[in-house]
Amino acid sequence: MFAALITGKGTVEMVEFADPTPAPKGVVVDISFCGICGTDIHAYQSGKPYHPAICGHEWAGVVSAKGAEVKSFTEGDRVIVATAPACGSCEACRAGQADRCQVAFLSMIGRDPLAPAHGGFAQRIPVAAARVVKTNTALTEQQAAMVEPTTVAFHAVRRSGIHLGDIAVVQGAGPIGLGTMQWVKAAGAGVVIVVEPNEQRRALAIELGAHYAIEPGEPADQLVKQLSHGLGADIVYECVGRPFAVQAAVDLARRGGSMCLIGLADQDAAITPGSWLIKEISVTSALAYMHEEFEMAMGMIADGRFRTEPMHSSTIGIDGLDTALSDLASGTSTQTKILVDPRL
């Protein structure tokens, strides 16, 4: 069996692995689709040594084998990879912070003892049974592969403290930005503005329900001032993952407003602390999600309150991964969410 690994800057290698067998508390999943994530693009651009299980972490598939101690799954079950439930016994859990479970976090970043030696850019993968969730029967295979990034945005909006009627700005119309925009609307924002330089992505934001989609810089500044009577946005979601966007988010917010940091920049950001202080900006940040939020988000996709299909821009085989990552890393790609189908 072969899996595609990002092994260095601009380098994807096909590496051969033995056909997997399940651990006693694990399952083997035949992968249907695996989405390309911003983390994969960062790894490809930077060559940073991410754990092999990190790249290719947005996958869905079918259980093909299970360990002797696994009772909750059977062969043929459709499943999606997710963050494990809180363990209940680590220091964070005992302190009443199950949402900061250290064991679940280690599994999420691929550093627990049962972490696989590769991610989901493969035909199949062995994984702890605690890491998978049964797919809602209403979801297609493609929708299932997009639940994971959708839940990242879901968690961020839940943490952000948005209020009914707020003027909300979402910076960036990639998969996370478009997901955040949809959840912000579902949370009751009065006006939702997407700031995005790419014309095609702006059009997609409008299709998915944004009230406005505008270019960054002066056009965005003027629109926000116009809609807020000169005050600024109540809350700004930073989904670009570039250093310059952090201060830009604060610049768009009103005094007493909020900024939610979701995009992960791989370099330090230059900020103007005085503007943060003068505006008394409240800041939240969001990484991944809680296990129970996965079920919530999946249910809302299943009943039509969140749309994934327009964000799915293309499907490729594993042999097209290198080219796709190069395109996405260029900064000029019009692709939104590319799914890898290892069966092609």
Regions found by a protein language model. Give the residues of each.
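C-terminal hydrophobic helical "lid"/dimerization subdomain
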Residues: 1-3, 247-251, 291-344
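Short N-terminal strand-loop motif that marks the start
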Residues: 1-60, 123, 343-344
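Glycine-rich beta-strand-centered segment in the early N-terminal region that forms part
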Residues: 20-34, 47-94, 136-138
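Cysteine-cluster motifs in flexible loop/terminal segments that predominantly coordinate metals
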Residues: 37, 82-133
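Mid-domain Rossmann-like dinucleotide-binding core that forms the NAD(H)/NADP(H) cofactor-binding site
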Residues: 130, 136-218, 222
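Glycine-rich cofactor phosphate-binding loops and adjacent beta1-alpha1 units
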Residues: 160-162, 203-282
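Rossmann-fold dehydrogenase core element
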Residues: 258-260, 271-311
